[in-house]
Amino acid sequence: MQAAMNVMFWNVGRRARAARRAGALGLLVLLAGLLGTAALAAETLVVGPEGTPLSLTAALSQAQDGDTIELLPGEYRDAHAVLENRRLTIRGIGKRPLISGGGKPSGTHKALWLVRGGEVVLENLEFRGARAADGEGAGVRQEGGRLVVRRCDFFDNEYGVHALNDDRAELTIQDSVLGMAPKVVGGLHHLLNVGRIARLSVSGSRFQQGFEGHLIKSRARESLIRYNFIHDGQRGGASYEIELPAGGLATVIGNVIGQGADSQNRVMLAYGTDGRPWDRNTLLVAHNTFISYKWTPAWFMRVFSDGLPADTEVVAVNNLLVGPGLFWLGAPGYFDGNRPAVRGMLRDADTYAFELAPGSVWHGSGIDPRQVGRRDLSPQAEFEWPVGTRALEAGRTTWSPGAYQR
């Protein structure tokens, strides 16, 4: 009797295990089918400057979630576009296609391209000549969603990229160039103008040739500005190189930040100018090379404490300060390893070789940035000309001030 029961239970267990295996196999087949269907559903639409194979308007009207639109080389004149609530990648193929506004007002959307929600990636495109009747014409204007801009150029636009207030929006800019602000007296045209969004990340990018406006202006709750060349040129006429008027959680690491002799403002990095900060406010500034071409003293970094909460935290370590000026005077916080220098102490400032010259007394003079309180502020990369980054070797035990460890 016991033997019979053992056989019965063994058979039941074997059938149960087989059923489970069959169920799992069926689930895997179903998932594979769904993934295959999704992969097959994603399409690549090709656009040409003369409208063949498709025009940009036609491609945008046909595109579905997950699709890619590829632009052939050439100039796309008056190719205004609205991208709404989709997952979409638009990339240039080969030589960077030019999206041209021709220096004329761009209509109701005040941008060459308007990104309205969704998850959008723009790659290998150039936006030039955006204008609007109110002076706020943008190459790309973001109204919500997540936008990634990668390997794109923005020249001669009233705003290169303009992100409007939306506390859930995110903007990422990688390996791009923003420059040549229109020379309009009183225009205040910023190369990058970011409203009160959730997060801004900028890396491996170059900002140059501003005029009266700022190179970077961000009111984001979190601003990560790392490994960029934010340098207006020796005769540049921008105002602030970086302005963070609403405070927030700001990380500024590994950048070259240069202010031209014709700048209308001697402050290079400004934090908290609005008096309307976020609920959490921390400024981390590490391993930047600040360069002032003015004869009068610069104010390399200014924290507007009067408009910030009492618990605002400021940490600045291992920055290289080239030229006459002030850095931490009057600013609350922790400062260490920041070193003054003149251009002659650099390898070759005239050719933008801003690393310390061989034999400099400042080589290896920085503090260990991996142990600043409970934070690791060590740079993981360096800006690599003309755009992009170069990873630093792991295992470093000595640190030099500034954006370069060469």
What is the predicted role of each segment?
Residues 1-20:
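N-terminal secretory signal peptides that target proteins for export/translocation
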Residues 43-72, 76-78, 360-363:
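Acidic Gly/Asp/Thr-rich repetitive segments characteristic of extracellular carbohydrate-active
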Residues 359-406:
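Surface beta-loop-beta hairpin patches that serve as ligand-binding interfaces in beta-rich domains
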Residues 37-41:
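Sec/Tat signal peptide C-region and signal peptidase I cleavage site
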Residues 44, 48-54, 68-70, 86-135, ...:
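Right-handed parallel beta-helix/beta-spiral solenoid domain characteristic of secreted/periplasmic
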Residues 80-81, 98-115, 127-355, 359-360, ...:
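Glycine- and acidic/polar-rich repeat regions and solenoidal domains
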Residues 74-76, 94-96, 366-370:
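Acidic glycine-/aspartate-rich tracts in secreted/extracellular proteins
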Residues 24-36:
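Bacterial N-terminal signal peptides
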